């Protein structure tokens, strides 16, 4: 009888671990992160992501990633509500800190928004930066988590 209980408990623990590990993949979804960080409402058909760089390896949730976004008209209109180029000093410093790993393409006319997901710290630890290029209609999502 004790053996049956032990097996049941072990089975429940294993099932729980499987459910948690499957659910955590949801957090690795860059489209969901884009929507959450920037308060955007995007239909599945209105946003296609292309991964340009990603070094999220080893420890979960630590790394840098750059995605190119092809978005619909509704999302582009939302981008027009953001800060217009040039970047602020804070955004320039953030991009400079990542320049050894990844760089955005040259953009002359566009809009941008930076979200510090760990406010109150003096260092950049969890930051998302999205940049919209008006000339090409493309957007770029740059995320960093350390």
Model-derived features with residue positions:
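Sec-dependent bacterial lipoprotein signal peptides
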Residues: 1-20
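Short amphipathic alpha-helical segments that mediate assembly, nucleic-acid/protein binding
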Residues: 3-5, 31, 91
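Generic structural motif
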Residues: 6, 72-74, 135, 146
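Non-membrane alpha-helical secondary structure
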Residues: 7, 26, 87-90
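Intrinsically disordered, low-complexity segments
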Residues: 19, 56-57, 120, 126
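N-terminal export/targeting and maturation segments
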Residues: 22-81
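Extended Gly/Ser/Thr-rich low-complexity repeat segments
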Residues: 79-89
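Extracytoplasmic electrostatic interaction patches
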Residues: 88-146
């Amino acid at each position: 009888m004790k053996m049956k209980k032990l097996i049941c408990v072990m089975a429940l623990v294993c099932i729980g671990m499987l459910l948690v590990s499957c659910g955590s993949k949801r957090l690795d979804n860059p489209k969901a992160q884009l929507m959450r960080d920037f308060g955007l409402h995007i239909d599945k058909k209105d946003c296609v992501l292309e991964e340009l760089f990603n070094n999220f390896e080893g420890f979960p949730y630590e790394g840098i990633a750059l995605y190119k976004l092809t978005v619909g008209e509704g999302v582009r209109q939302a981008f027009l509500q953001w800060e217009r180029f040039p970047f602020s000093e804070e955004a320039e410093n953030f991009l400079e800190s990542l320049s050894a790993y990844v760089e955005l393409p040259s953009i002359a006319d566009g809009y941008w928004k930076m979200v510090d997901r760990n406010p109150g710290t003096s260092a950049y630890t969890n930051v998302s930066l999205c940049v919209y290029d008006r000339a090409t209609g493309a957007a770029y999502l740059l995320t960093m988590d350390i």
